Amino acid sequence: MAKVTDIVLWDKPGERVLLLGNHAIARGALEANIAVFAAYPGTPSSELTDTMAAVAKKAGVYMEYSTNEKVAFETALAAAWSGLRAMTAMKHVGLNVAADSFLSSVGMGVEGGFVIMVADDPSMWSSQNEQDTRVYAKFANVPVLEPSSPHEAKEMTKYAFELSEKFKHFVILRTTTRSSHARGDVVLGELPEEIKTGKRKFGKFKKDPTRFVDVPAHARKFHPLILEKIEKIREELNNCPFNWIEGKEDAKVGIIAPGLSYAYVKEALAWLGVEDVKILKLGTPFPVPYGLLGKFFDGLEKVLIVEELEPVVEEQVKTWAYDKGLRIPIHGKDLVPRVYEMTTRRAVEAIAKFLGLETPINFAEIDEKYEKVSQIVPPRPPSLCPACPHRNSFFAIRKAAGPKAIYPSDIGCYTLGVLPPLRTVDTTVAMGASIGIGHGLSIAMNGSLAEEEHKEGKEKQIIVATIGDSTFYHTGLPALANAIYNRSNVLIVVLDNLVTAMTGDQPNPGTGQTPHGMGKRIPIEDVAKAMGADFVAVVDPYDIKATYETIKKALEVEGVSVVVSRQVCALYKIGQMRRRGMKWPIYHVVEDKCTGCKICINAYGCPAIYWDPETKKAKVDPTMCWGCGGCAQVCPFDAFEPMKEGE
């Protein structure tokens, strides 16, 4: 069976293949002759980034895992200034990180096509909010393309580069969790010769200070030019191949469906058995093409806009209709929820209310049954993997700092430390926020060591911030510099599992690896020492006792302490071992030694360990044990031992 990375590079125009939405976008970028791709991984965009990393060398594309989205944006933007086709990708909250450069550079335009792929996450399946990128785009006056299928995602990617070059303007390709992760038929197009031969493309930057030096005197002229340009793009989108009107021409009711909502609307109409309706399928939620609106509204008596999250299309349509003097009812967020993702059910309920119909399914009855079943089925909360080094780090931190300590944390697998029995996460906000929050708490409760009023000699509030290795490089560095500079009193534990694990095992500056070979590794402890941290140490969390003792020592220091807890991600390590046919030790419980104290369950919480109610002893599920030996270290009665060959 062919790998996805092979399929994405197939030179088979016309071949129909099954691809994920993100994989289809990667193929589209290659068909568009992309030269530079830079991104920071973030679900639900990561598959695009990883696919580009896998094919970059073979396709002659420069690809990098940037340290954060702002840097990725700037890297790709500079390539586009140099006349190359460039792309950056990020999840929706990543655009917050890139926003400073994004909003400040829109007016400068581009030379080569520049596409910003942003993957939104309605319902927050893997995110801390469900912000709508289309609102950002409207604010910045950047056009948005939004696909309704994987094939359309591929074709839209190519069109986005063409649109960007035609107007020398940024273009956002907006997906959602469902469109990024949906699979569907994709018809392959022609690959450019440079991609097929793997010929690397190089650009040329032409100096123009009045354009690229964003001082007020230069920037002042940009705003009117941006507004003029977006209206020209609006006019262009009247002929966009991803916008069309379908259904009965003489219908009295109409539905506007942008992006993936179009697929839900089509399915909902089939459920309801409704055919006497006109549909405006929008692939460009911003700016909405007004010429197409005029054709669509002709003869209609009422309209429903079905869109996820914010009323971006609705506001544009209502403004246009008001200016045109149209006084027909236009419904949107009064019938379609403003929160969480679109579903077929939501589309059915909204359209049924709009048309005064009964839903074909009794959803209330289904909800009632679901509630009853939910009470019977035992909950299965997420947990850290067996052998996860973060569990050992948290166990040692909790033991050393105690339950009264405050534990700001960050975005990563380790956020699961909030759950029992570890309970060593008290706050999470955004990437890198653990150190800033930890510093703020320390200043608020302990004061700064630079202050005369510092609570010297008094019992200090212990604050232990935890942050991952990739997150440390992403946005942890400025916060660490700030804490050291302002003489904070906080312990920062960097949970270094030598990979960007949660988003798919991508490399980062701490690993030194890049898609093009070995870069330069930047050890976290060297950075902390260079910044002037008052205490720096490196521990192996698989040695719980040594980790505990080091953390106790760090807590005694007045100032900023940094402990790097370094051990490779267990899931990544086991995957590598499986591919190489290697084995790992499996632990079991010696029943005669087990007293049933439950420390291994109630304090440590490895998912491979469970309670046997018959023997009243702990047991290890051998299919889940990955042999880290943490259980043997936390058990006070030495009841855990590695199984011998043949047991």
From Swiss-Prot:
[4Fe-4S] cluster 2 binds at residues 606, 625, 628, 631. Optimum temperature is 70 degrees Celsius. Residues 585-614, 616-645 form the 4Fe-4S ferredoxin-type domain. InterPro entries: 4Fe4S_Fe-S-bd (IPR017896), 4Fe4S_Fe_S_CS (IPR017900), HACL1-like (IPR045025), IorA (IPR017721), Pyrv_Fd/Flavodoxin_OxRdtase_N (IPR002880), THDP-binding (IPR029061), TPP_enzyme_TPP-bd (IPR011766), Transketo_C/PFOR_II (IPR009014). The keyword Aminoacyl-tRNA synthetase does not apply. Its EC number is 1.2.7.8. Its cofactor is [4Fe-4S] cluster. Pfam families: Fer4_7, POR_N, TPP_enzyme_C. [4Fe-4S] cluster 1 binds at residues 594, 597, 600, 635. One of its GO terms (molecular function) is 4 iron, 4 sulfur cluster binding. It is an enzyme of class 1 (oxidoreductase). Keywords: 4Fe-4S, Electron transport, Iron, Iron-sulfur, Metal-binding, Oxidoreductase, Repeat, Transport. Binds 2 [4Fe-4S] clusters. In this family the first cluster has a non-standard and varying [4Fe-4S] binding motif CX(2)CX(2)CX(4-5)CP. Catalyzes the ferredoxin-dependent oxidative decarboxylation of arylpyruvates. Heterodimer of the IorA and IorB subunits. PANTHER family: 2-HYDROXYACYL-COA LYASE, INDOLEPYRUVATE OXIDOREDUCTASE SUBUNIT IORA. This is Indolepyruvate oxidoreductase subunit IorA. It comes from Thermococcus kodakarensis (strain ATCC BAA-918 / JCM 12380 / KOD1). The lineage of its organism: Archaea, Methanobacteriati, Methanobacteriota, Thermococci, Thermococcales.
